[in-house]
UniProtKB/Swiss-Prot annotation:
SUPFAM superfamilies: Nucleotidylyl transferase (SSF52374), Ribosomal protein L25-like (SSF50715). The lineage of its organism: Bacteria, Pseudomonadati, Pseudomonadota, Gammaproteobacteria, Lysobacterales. This is Glutamine--tRNA ligase. L-glutamine binds at D74, Y218. GO terms for cellular component: cytosol.
Length: 580
């Protein structure tokens, strides 16, 4: 795995996007002396390709400016979270090549968040509200109509503090009370109409057990966690732009830098004291055609068994993309290529595929395989003919060395490389025609062997003995070159041909009463059984190859072994997708 270091990042050409420009100005003006970012996923599912953009930005910015990035599990909704998701998140971030300076959890700060809430109550900035969720929505108003104050808005700080402590003690059932910020029920920003800061939820937490029957809401916990950790720049996607005034409200009214006593529970646990006044900056989220990235929809695909799990190679989770054969370098190149802006746009899926092709073309060794094999018998060679040919592992990179490839009288070739009635422009095998066998010489087809039903079962041909590599006849011009695998030495392999999961560009388009389920591509996975040269079988899982003339393939992360090779097609050699 390639790892991104501060030195590596600083050696790259200077990036000019608006976020980095803001950071440069903050450093130049002395607003900050160092940069501290964070990546704060909720451990309630697997990361997807959209998260890769945030990861590369959060960690990349920190590395470029010699700073740090914290990985924080935003674990404030325990009913939907799982330690397995938290472990997968750490694995995915590491796989992408990034390393966090600290692993934190919002639950690490529950005591501090509780004390901060008590401070807001004492300052008259928060109150306990008895409205249920439906009533809260009714009182909140609309975009064109101001909200109404809760009947409980004017409770005294003492009464609110007593009720909040009873909430903390577990006295009240779920949903009966919330702690709300006291801001402005007439605000044009609905997020500022007395948003909830805490709700009652008697649910066991993966880290704190049953200690807490109340949990902080996202906006409150997120803002203060940033401040607690000393985050300087809190990078979020555009949907949080309207939440920024609430983010700032929480930070400014709790004011941790001037109320350091609130941090005592952390200091007692050995956490550093590093509160800050972070700045939230929003950027556009990643949208790609032919995909859905809603966690709810991805979960439905798995739960309804429309795919084969979260790491199905057709999924857009990082686990799925990794199993498909996407590399960390290709993912980082993709994020770099699409750039950072505030403008929402839809990226064509081919951009992602081209980044993978570009990376694998450089690093992937070449091998020969047939996915629709047909026998070719070179009848002018002895039946026991066998030799070892020397092939380069990579035609553009001598440092990858060479390999031996067995060659014999009987070969497997690709069925699609022969045509009895060839179309115009055909350059491969035809009856009586010639073709170059990669690295072995020029062959002519003399006979087409068919079974009783008239199906072709083999070709018989002749190998020009003067056209072998190094001989004068090897320079004779023929129209086409095909790959092959020596039949006696071939290793049978399961080859999974993956394609895009959806057949239309906008599977989220619910027109005509259809949903994304109606646009699943029936050809997104085909399993064939072919043959590979021995050098392709003897390799570890997650090893990428270019199967010559076929595409880029990777040994399956879970199912491959040398005795039962399993290859996943990562991407074709060129973009052949038919657009609408």
């Amino acid at each position: 795995m390639s790892e991104i270091t501060t030195t590596d990042a600083q050696a790259q050409p200077e990036k000019k996007d608006f976020i980095r420009q803001i950071i440069r100005e903050d450093l130049a003006h002395g607003t900050h002396t160092h940069i501290h970012t964070r990546f704060p996923p909720e451990p309630n599912g697997y990361l997807h390709i959209g998260h890769a953009k945030a990861i590369c930005l959060d960690f990349g910015v920190a590395a470029e400016f010699g700073g740090h990035c914290t990985l924080r599990m935003d674990d404030t909704n325990p009913s939907k979270e799982d330690p397995a998701f938290a472990a997968a998140i750490q694995e995915d971030v590491s796989w992408l090549g990034f390393h966090w300076n600290a692993l934190r959890h919002t639950s690490d700060y529950f005591e501090v968040l509780y004390l901060a809430a008590e401070k807001l109550i004492a300052d008259g900035k928060a109150y306990v509200c008895d409205l249920n969720s439906e009533q809260v929505r009714e009182y909140r108003g609309t975009l064109t109509e101001a909200g109404r104050p809760s009947p409980w808005r004017e409770r005294s700080p003492d009464e609110n503090l007593e009720l909040f402590r009873q909430m903390r003690a577990g006295t009240f059932p779920d949903g009966t009370r919330t702690l709300r910020a006291k801001i402005d029920m007439a605000s044009g920003n609905i997020n500022l109409r007395d948003p909830a800061l805490y709700r009652i939820k008697h649910v066991e937490h993966q880290n704190t057990g049953n200690t807490w029957p109340i949990y902080p809401m996202y906006d409150f916990a997120h803002a203060l966690s940033d401040a607690i950790e000393g985050i300087t720049h809190s990078l979020c996607t555009l949907e949080f732009e309207d939440h920024r005034p609430l983010y700032d409200w929480c930070i400014n009214h709790v004011d941790l830098p001037n109320n350091s006593h609130l941090l005592k529970p952390l200091l007692d646990k050995g956490f550093p004291q590093e509160p800050s006044q972070p700045r939230q900056i929003e950027f556009s989220r990643l949208n790609i055609n032919y995909t859905v990235m809603s966690k709810r929809k991805l979960t439905a695909l798995v739960d309804e068994k429309l795919v084969e799990g979260w790491d199905d190679p057709r999924m857009y989770t990082l686990q799925g993309l990794r199993r498909r054969g996407y590399t960390p370098a290709a993912m980082r190149l993709f994020v770099e290529r699409i750039g950072i802006s505030k403008q929402n746009s839809i990226i064509d899926f081919s951009v992602l595929e081209n980044c993978l092709r570009e990376n694998l073309d450089t690093i992937a060794p070449r091998r020969m395989a047939t996915i629709a094999p047909m026998k070719l018998v070179l009848t002018n060679l002895p039946e026991d003919h066998e030799e070892q040919l020397i092939f380069p592992n990579h035609p553009k990179d001598d440092t990858q060395g060479t390999r031996t490839v067995p060659f014999s009288r009987e070969l497997w070739i690709e069925r699609d490389d022969f045509s009895e009635v060839p179309p115009k422009g055909w350059k491969r095998l035809v009856p009586g025609g010639e073709v170059r066998l990669r690295g072995a010489g020029i062959a002519r087809i003399d006979e087409v062997v068919k079974n009783a039903e008239g199906h072709i079962i083999a070709l018989h041909g002749w190998l020009d003995p003067t056209s072998r590599p190094g001989m004068e006849g090897a320079h004779r011009k023929v129209k086409g070159t095909i790959h092959w695998v020596s039949a006696p030495h071939a290793v049978a392999a399961e080859i999974r041909l993956y394609d895009r999961l959806f057949s239309i560009e906008k599977p989220d388009d619910n027109t005509d009463g259809k949903t994304y389920r109606d646009f699943l591509n029936p050809d997104s996975k085909r399993v064939v059984h072919g043959y590979i040269e021995p050098a392709a079988a003897q390799t570890a899982p997650e090893h990428a190859f270019q199967f010559e003339r076929l595409g880029y393939f990777v040994t399956d992360r879970h199912d491959h072994d040398a005795t039962h090779p399993v290859f996943n097609r990562s991407v074709t050699l060129r973009d052949t997708w038919q657009r609408d």
